[in-house]
A protein has these predicted regions:
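C-terminal catalytic lobe of FAD-dependent flavoproteins
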Residues: 1-30
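Rhodanese-like catalytic fold shared by cysteine-dependent sulfurtransferases
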Residues: 28-80, 89-124, 128-167
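Structural scaffold elements adjacent to functional motifs in cytosolic proteins
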Residues: 83-85
Length: 167
């Protein structure tokens, strides 16, 4: 099934999802959907197609993520983790995780700072949602880090304590 709510063109998403369900589409099928769009009004890759592509990456192991609850469980188990907040300094100053293992390292500085980071820790980059966290994870993997997973949902979906104001 599918549920659709919110601003934007919900009817289109519902129609596409209903058609996919009716035809028995797999995640791989949906990732290949080529839907019509108008550049001034929508993106080239529909959000449903993008979601299917993200799922493909997760199922194949290309994208390895942890939920905020899994991150918290690792913390409670004493796992040696480093939470990398890869958002901009302005975003960090506005709101940040209140977590002893979280620190700011903006995405644009990850490549330069990676050689200074110990490689024996589990690195968990995150951002507002997930995209920059995923990108930072790929940068670290490209620099030889073996223990890297990004945090799904980022700050927006962190259900634990946050700090606000100047960081």
């Amino acid at each position: 099934g599918v549920q659709v709510a919110g601003p934007g063109n919900c009817a289109k998403r519902l129609d596409v999802a209903a058609a996919a369900i009716t035809m028995g589409a797999t995640v791989d099928d949906m990732a290949q959907f080529n839907l019509g769009y108008a550049p001034p009004y929508s993106v080239a890759i529909d959000v449903l197609v993008n979601a299917a592509q993200v799922m493909q990456n997760k199922l194949s192991g290309v994208a390895q993520a942890l939920t905020p609850l899994e991150v918290q469980a690792l913390t409670e188990q004493g796992e040696d983790i480093m939470l990398l907040d890869v958002r901009t300094p302005a975003e960090f100053a506005e709101v940040r995780l209140k977590h002893p293992k979280a620190f700011a390292l903006p995405l644009g500085r990850v490549r330069d700072k990676a050689p200074d980071l110990p490689k024996d820790k589990l690195y968990i980059p995150f951002c507002k949602l997930s995209l920059r966290g995923y990108e930072a994870a790929k940068i670290l993997e490209g620099q030889g880090f073996k223990r890297v997973k990004f945090m799904d949902g980022g700050v927006i979906h962190w259900p634990f304590e946050l700090e606000y104001g100047k960081g």
